[in-house]
Amino acid sequence: MKKRFLSICTMTIAALATTTMVNTSYAKTDTESHNHSSLGTENKNVLDINSSSHNIKPSQNKSYPSVILPNNNRHQIFNTTQGHYDAVSFIYIPIHGGYMSGSGVVVGENEILTNKHVVNGAKGNPRNISVHPSAKNENDYPNGKFVGQEIIPYPGNSDLAILRVSPNEHNQHIGQVVKPATISSNTDTRINENITVTGYPGDKPLATMWESVGKVVYIGGEELRYDLSTVGGNSGSPVFNGKNQVIGIHYGGVDNKYNSSVYINDFVQQFLRNNIPDINIQ
C-alpha cells in the first residue's frame, strides 16, 4: 500500500513568515532558505510538489530541499538509547493520507523542544503529533510513543516551540522513560567551537537517527549558524556542544552558505524556565 510523504522545507530568513513543505520521508530542511522539518506547510510554492495528489515514497531518485554544504560529515547513530542520544526524538504527524516528520529533544518530564513550523503541521491539534524518543527506524521504537497534549510557541519571532506530551499507555512520563537533555547556559559558546546536530533527516531511511559534525560560524541574538550539512526532517534537531549540552534547536539554512538554529540565549532560557519546571540549564 503506497503512502504519501510530506515534509517541510523552506523558510527564508529574509521573510520569516514563509515556510515551505517538502516531502516527509526525505526532506527536513532548514530555515533562512529552507525549513528543515518534514512537517507543516504554508508556502504555496511547494504545494504542487507535496500535495496529496502526489504519491511520494522514499527513494534514492526523489529530489528534496536540503542545505548540503562542503562539510557533509554525517553518520548514522545506531546506539540511539545511549547517553545524550536517548533524548533525541522522531516526530510524526499524519496528514492528507500520508505524514509529515521532524525532530525534537526531550528536555523535561513531559516536554519536547522543536520548531514552530514542525508542530504547526498538527493544524492546532497537538494530539495529531506522536513523539518517538530514541527511534532506531520505522519498525523499532525502543522507548515507545507519546502523544502531544499542548503546544507552547515561543512568543518571539524565533522558530521554537515546546510540545508537552501525555504519559504513555503505561502512565509513564517521557522524562521518566528517557533522561531529559541538559541545556547549556551558553556562557562559553564560541565561534569555531565543535558541535553536532542530531536528528532524523528525510534523505535517509525513515526514522533513522543521524548526526552531523561541524563548527559554529556565527552567534548573534537568537541565531546560531554552523558549517555542517542538514536535510529536510532535521527541523527541531538539538545542536549539541562538546559536553553534549543543547545550545540550540535547528530550523533551517541558506544554500551553499550555512545552516542555522535558534540559539538558546538568556531570553530563550527564561522562556524555558517559565514553562518547564524541571528544565536543567547548566
UniProtKB/Swiss-Prot annotation:
PROSITE patterns: V8_SER. It is found in: Secreted. Keywords: Hydrolase, Protease, Secreted, Serine protease, Signal, Virulence, Zymogen. One of its GO terms (cellular component) is extracellular region. The active site is at residues 117, 159, 235. GO terms for molecular function: serine-type endopeptidase activity. Exhibits a significant hydrolytic activity for the carbonyl side of glutamic acid. Shows activity toward human fibronectin and type 1 collagen. InterPro entries: Glutamyl_endopeptidase, Peptidase_S1_PA, Peptidase_S1_PA_chymotrypsin, Peptidase_S1B, Peptidase_S1B_tx, V8_ser_AS. Its EC number is 3.4.21.19. It catalyses: Preferential cleavage: Glu-|-Xaa, Asp-|-Xaa. It comes from the Bacteria. Residues 1-27 form the signal peptide. Residues 28-66 form a propeptide. This is Glutamyl endopeptidase. Belongs to the peptidase S1B family. GO terms for biological process: proteolysis.
